[in-house]
């Protein structure tokens, strides 16, 4: 299609491949493209994947065992074991999750220095009908995620919240990903969700008749972060053997005089 411009009356210029124009108060012509495009600038990356199989008997039995050893959380209960991915029964699930953590790092962050995100803590959440997950973030973590062991895709959701101060508050006629303060996604059994650890999230009171079970985890970085030229260089060495210092609600130090230890 030709993009030549043509002269019209009063020496006004319009583009021949633009379908509509509007006359301003100055009698000049302002061109408008037929289909304007709104770009998403600096969007928050939330990754969804799905385990391509059912959970094995060994995995199910391990989860059942953990359900008998729980501690009270705000709104629900969590496993006493805070490193469930270190157990051999979940080795295959850990590999599945690590694959997508690597994918997230490559496709989203795309670092050129040798750096990787590895799983640190991992724990199980048990949410009975009518219970909830309080609104929270995951400090001391880079990417966080959830693998759903038992969830109803028709009723179970995860809510995310926009971070930062809202300068102007306008009543909204039609919610979208630009004007919303929160956004939710349905989740089901075998779904995996990855997101930046700073992103605030929560679960409303569950409506399902079954116990919602999810496996949450954190990650951190290992390798060469930043660069010397920009004075941001940081070398994070080999990961720590967490089995040597893992603490649970049972074996952690008790409150001491003057505060908690």
Task: Name each model feature, range by range.
Residues 124-194, 204, 221-233:
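Catalytic core of non-heme Fe(II) oxygenases with the double-stranded beta-helix
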Residues 2-7:
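Arg/Lys-rich low-complexity patches in intrinsically disordered regions that function as generic
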């Amino acid at each position: 299609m030709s993009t030549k411009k043509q002269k019209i009356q009063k020496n006004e210029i319009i583009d021949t491949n633009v379908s509509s124009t509007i006359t301003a108060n100055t009698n000049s012509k302002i061109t408008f493209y037929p289909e304007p495009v709104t770009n998403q600038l600096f969007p928050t990356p939330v990754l969804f994947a799905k385990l391509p199989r059912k959970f094995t008997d060994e995995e199910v039995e391990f989860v059942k065992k953990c359900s008998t050893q729980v501690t009270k959380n705000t709104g629900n209960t969590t496993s006493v074991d805070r490193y469930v991915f270190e157990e051999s029964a979940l080795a295959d699930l850990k590999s599945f999750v690590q694959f997508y953590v690597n994918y997230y790092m490559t496709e989203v962050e795309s670092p050129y220095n040798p750096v990787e995100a590895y799983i640190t803590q991992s724990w199980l959440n048990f949410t009975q009908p009518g219970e909830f997950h309080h609104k929270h973030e995951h400090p001391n973590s880079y990417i966080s995620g959830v693998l759903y062991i038992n969830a109803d895709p028709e009723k179970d959701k995860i809510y995310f919240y926009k971070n930062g101060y809202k300068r102007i508050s306008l009543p909204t006629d039609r919610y979208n990903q630009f004007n919303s303060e929160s956004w939710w996604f349905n989740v089901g059994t075998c779904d995996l969700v990855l997101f930046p650890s700073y992103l605030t999230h929560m679960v409303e009171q569950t409506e399902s008749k079954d116990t919602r079970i999810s496996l949450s985890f954190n990650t951190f970085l290992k390798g060469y972060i930043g660069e010397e030229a920009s004075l941001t260089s940081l070398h994070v060495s080999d990961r720590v053997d967490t089995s040597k210092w893992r603490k649970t609600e049972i074996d952690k130090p008790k409150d001491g005089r003057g505060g908690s230890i």
